[in-house]
Amino acid sequence: KGAGVAVALSLAAVTSVPALAADSIVQAGETVNGGTLENHDNQIVFGTANGMTISTGLELGPDSEENTGGQWIQNGGIAGNTTVTTNGRQVVLEGGTASDTVIRDGGGQSLNGLAVNTTLNNRGEQWVHEGGVATGTIINRDGYQSVKSGGLATGTIINTGAEGGPDSDNSYTGQKVQGTAESTTINKNGRQIILFSGIARDTLIYAGGDQSVHGRALNTTLNGGYQYVHKDGLALNTVINEGGWQVVKAGGAVGNTTINQNGELRVHAGGEATAVTQNTGGALVTSTAATVTGINRLGAFSVMEGKADNVVLENGGRLDVLTGHTATNTRVDDGGTLDVRNGGTATTVSMG
């Protein structure tokens, strides 16, 4: 800190660093091992910094440009095995790389470069901005990853966000996607929220985990988990295996869903599911106020415009025929329910 004038002059060439409390620069080709940043200290990394502990840079709130202090990884810079703790901030700029970072207790990582194998614990946060790539992030209890428009997260493992129950609002935990998320694994208590502009591809959801779709979800596999498709949300090519549920709410749409044995597709009134494949033992739960088309073991089936035809109900499946609506050629097998409301009509019902 004694060479403050020289440090200040060097900062003229540094990208996106506030001109306050600049304390150390790791030059290209230089390696620094260990150390602590606090009290608005800055570390500007063009070379390599290993094993730093950061507890400054977020005093003015998460992901705020008004903050000063923290670690700044420049183009070509590398940070490894960093611990970011209370009020700490690591900024990874375009061309910079951070690996094996642990973020906890209210610390955060702002990412326009590359982050590999980040772990988010107790209120640790990662913000993936436009151009940023996060790969292999693990989100543990009360951790949070925000993938902004133009950001990419790949191989994320989500273990938090759904502790309050399926499809509930747990605020800033789990993963929220405005950009792109690929090859995500959602475990028990994990939640991925895909916002209107967001896209999620190749997601695996296990029992106790869920995905809330307001944007687009492609190629999701439900191995006991839940997928909720909300108004204006779209899910394509979902596979529902044992214990999995796909729930299509009013204004939501899904296409090419496959329901396997002990899986369940629920389509609410005003929801739409097209090109469904219902395999033996798969359950369809819907009403004549929804739109559902596809194939089952009887052949083509449909529910649309108040008319249901060739529907198979089994293993928890249910069809509600509403007032003024009709159902024809319905097959009700073990565990299936056909509920014809007052004023509804069902003809040619066969029982298993």
Task: Show the residue positions of the predicted features.
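Short, T/G/N/S-enriched strand-turn elements that build extracellular solenoid repeat scaffolds
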Residues: 24, 31-38, 49-64, 79-85, ...
